[in-house]
Amino acid sequence: VLRACDELGMLVWEEIPVVDLIALGDEFRANATSALREMIRQHYNHPSVIMWGYMNEAVIQLQYRVKKQRLNGFYENTLALARHLEETLKREDAYRLSTMAYHGNQIYNKIGLSNITDISGWNLYQGWYENDFKSFDRFVDEEHRKYPHRPLIISEFGAGSDPRLQSLDPQIFDFSMQWQQLYLEYYLPAIMKRPFIVGATEWNFIDFSSASRQEATPHINNKGLMYNCLLYTSPSPRDC
């Protein structure tokens, strides 16, 4: 994949699978450090890789899986691990940028996690999971107002759709093709007109497996711009 990206001139953000919840203990820290070091050493010579990542939505599960009285300990542990991984990354590759993706919650700013990497990545879904489209404008404008020095990437944005669902009156989270289209038609101009947003990635290119999801298509995250026709319409790959 990286060789194809090199040849096609595609830009790559590559990251290790440290996501959702940072475990306490030396074993987790050692494993994350090893994974980061291996990733950088294996792929250092690919010119398509422009940044390394080492956490994605790192505290999104804490409110559901950790008792309130233990939250501060987990926040401190996550912050310490992030600082350690940032130091490891810069020792391995002093030339590329570091990055981290956050879900749309101010806790990353509050605990200082968003101060560590070179680039801040926000996974934002206003108009899909929550609120309305204009909440996206308010979020990114306020973020830039408070932290004008930070390069900001919209590391994820997208809406789910099922090709079997069509609507003349599309609504938020209805999984119709029409709502996905409205979502993207709002987000793309909103991103492009803000020069402080230095990049954006639509999530996702194609529908993919997600075991825990029970939505329009069980076990599938269907935010893809393309879909697997075997899931919906065709009994045979030859018909796709």
Q: What kind of region is each of these model predictions?
A:
Residues 232-240:
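Single conserved hydrophobic/aromatic residue that forms the stacking wall/gate
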Residues 98-100, 152-154, 197-201:
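Acidic/polar loop patches that form or flank catalytic/metal-binding clefts of enzymes
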Residues 140, 180-188:
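Short, hydrophobic/amphipathic alpha-helical packing segments
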Residues 72-76, 173-182, 226-228:
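A short acidic, glycine-rich active-site loop
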Residues 40, 188-189:
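Generic structural signal for well-ordered alpha-helical scaffold segments
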Residues 157-172, 194-230:
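Aromatic/acidic polysaccharide-binding cleft in carbohydrate-active enzymes
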Residues 1-151, 161-170, 214-215:
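Active-site mouth of glycoside hydrolases
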